[in-house]
Amino acid sequence: LVVQRTGWGKSAVYFVATVLLREGWGDWRPGTPVPVPGSRGRPGGLGASVIISPLLALMRDQVAAASRAGIRAVTMNSANVTQWEEIQTQVAAGEVDVLLVSPERLNNPVFRDDVLPHLAASAALVVIDEAHCISDWGHDFRPDYRRIGPLISSLPSGVPVLATTATANDRVSRDIAEQLGFALAGVPTPEVYVVRGPLSRDYLRLGVLTLPEEGQRLGWLLAHLGELLGSGIIYTLTVSAAEDTASVLRAAGYDVLAYTGKTDADERAAAEQALKENHVKALVAT
């Protein structure tokens, strides 16, 4: 279990590990032939690493980051069901280094019964990203993450399991480790190695402004959004509030976009990119 702050390089850990394992370094011992670089996907070698990630936006970021590092990554999610068969063929042929799936896929009958057994049998590595979602003590508990336990239990002996998070306090970390350890060993006492670093970041600030009325909050945004440096995210409680807030801010001249469950998938991806590149002042999201 790796608990390190955002930007520490957790994704680099599993990307590098994937390459080393798929090229044969996991079995290498001094005095034996050195694995050949670029030999990923060789016959009889390890299959793709499986990364469980909770959000499509995170998956897109990880696929892009993997591509920049020369790693072949694909996703199987609710938005590309028609491509699942093609992706399965690519994985079976050793053409994929990393397969990203959402925890909800673990409860999909087709994925669970037809896809998952083959992945588990040959996986180089299993990664649970945003692992705080496993714990009901965590701020972002996802019930579907509880289904990861049976996946881990079904893995062949020796398949490494890595969990990563940037937002787990000590209690959440202990809960994650206990659950992973039980899934791995089938006993309450876990055998999980925990790497934990400082999570605070000096550039983050937290401020609280009490504005009980919706009109007051919108008025504050209209008056002060332009004074805030850079781009950011404005969170609202409902889809309608996000759309209404974005509409009012745009009418006032602010370059903002609504980002909700009703937003088209292509529009979401474009909005994410616009935010990262500071082409919009803010996304108004739920």
What are these regions (language model features)?
Residues 1-22, 36, 41-49, 53, ...:
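Helicase motor core with emphasis on the C-terminal RecA-like subdomain
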